[in-house]
Regions:
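Alpha/propeptide regions of enzymes that mature by internal proteolysis
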Residues: 1-191
Length: 191
């Protein structure tokens, strides 16, 4: 029910993940399945998940979506996107959120290039734009859900930009759009 993705070597991570979020040196990431009515201590539960699975210094995301049914990946150039999607609680930035439901969109991007911290932040911006565009194009009146998670993982390096005018940004957008579209198709089919 879970997904664990170890790296061959430690990578620089920037995320809003509930476990080891922020700027972090990560040995991998995981998508942890939780019950749809989950209201536990996420910090304790993620630490316990890491311990039980013999992991250390992983970035952890949580979802009530059935991970084996919805996990989708797409590799475009140096960018690989891993997406789990469920959209029972669509939201629009700047509007009152709907009643919380446990489905979410998690996006983890693994980039096989050396990025500055600024480029990591730029990657999150580009990926968010791609996520929003995909949702709108598929007919969802939403910019995301109330609990979306996103993380980018790359080696530290000299690449400064990852916006939509760059080759890297174009690949980020394509990978996110492809993986998210497929994950949402799988999620809809599982309803």
């Amino acid at each position: 029910m879970h997904y664990i993705h170890p790296f061959d070597e430690e990578m620089l991570a920037l995320s809003n993940a509930p476990h080891n979020g922020g700027l972090f040196k990560a040995k991998g990431f995981f998508f942890m399945h939780v019950h749809k009515n989950y209201d536990g201590d996420y910090k304790k539960d993620c630490l316990e998940f890491e311990r039980k699975n013999g992991l250390n210094n992983f970035v952890g995301f949580m979802t009530a979506a059935e991970i084996p049914k919805v996990l989708s990946t797409a590799k475009i150039g140096s960018v690989e996107a891993y997406v789990t999607a469920g959209i029972t609680n669509p939201a629009i930035a700047g509007e009152e959120p709907p009643k919380f439901m446990s489905k979410t969109i998690n996006i983890a991007l693994v980039i096989d290039e050396g990025l500055t911290i600024g480029a990591l932040a730029n990657t999150i911006m580009t990926a968010t734009e791609a996520k929003t565009y995909t949702l709108l194009k598929l007919g969802y009146e939403a910019t995301g859900t109330t609990s979306d998670g996103m993380g980018v993982f790359a080696n530290g390096g000299e690449i400064e930009w990852a916006g939509t005018a760059t080759k890297l940004g174009i690949n980020i957008g394509k990978a996110v759009r492809k993986a998210l579209k497929e994950s949402l198709r799988k999620w809809e089919a599982s309803l």
